[in-house]
């Protein structure tokens, strides 16, 4: 009985002395949250010096979809494309991070953007998919957005005819 009591006491003492440490995965996830937050906020505020400090030398930005501007861009090409995008807006674009979902190799940011396009209100929703290397640098961002809203509000093109309900189909 004394041995069992001693063993329980010893286990209790040892377990009280141990501190709970974060797993390597949890540390990487928190690091990635910080990196993508800094990266997006610098892009959103136009601080491209900070933005550039968060990306790798072989960084690419891919705009998915069927737009004439859809494709993959280097950092320098992204700067030109961002300037062209801003020219379609009356007072610039501001994005808001709605959610960040991170893993050990990257993150996803769910965004909502607000702007006044040349053809009216342009409030689009976005997904930015980030890949992050071992050095903690963003190697790629892949952006998903509504092509239809983009061409209607920024290019002034009507995409489809009269809006129909399910009952009308």
Language model: regions and residue ranges:
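Hydrophobic/aromatic beta-strand elements that line small-molecule binding cavities or substrate pockets
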Residues: 95-101, 113-114, 125-132
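Sec-dependent N-terminal signal peptides
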Residues: 4-13
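Short, cysteine-centered beta-strand-loop-beta hairpins and adjacent loop/turn segments enriched
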Residues: 88, 115-123
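Low-complexity, intrinsically disordered terminal/linker segments enriched in charged
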Residues: 140-169
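A short, polar/proline- and glycine-enriched secondary-structure boundary/capping micro-motif
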Residues: 72, 119-122, 149-155
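Short, low-complexity N-terminal intrinsically disordered segments enriched in polar/charged residues
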Residues: 16-53, 159-169
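Hydrophobic pocket/interface hotspot
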Residues: 39, 50-52, 59, 78, ...
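A solvent-exposed, acidic/Ser-Thr-rich amphipathic alpha-helical stretch
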Residues: 53-103
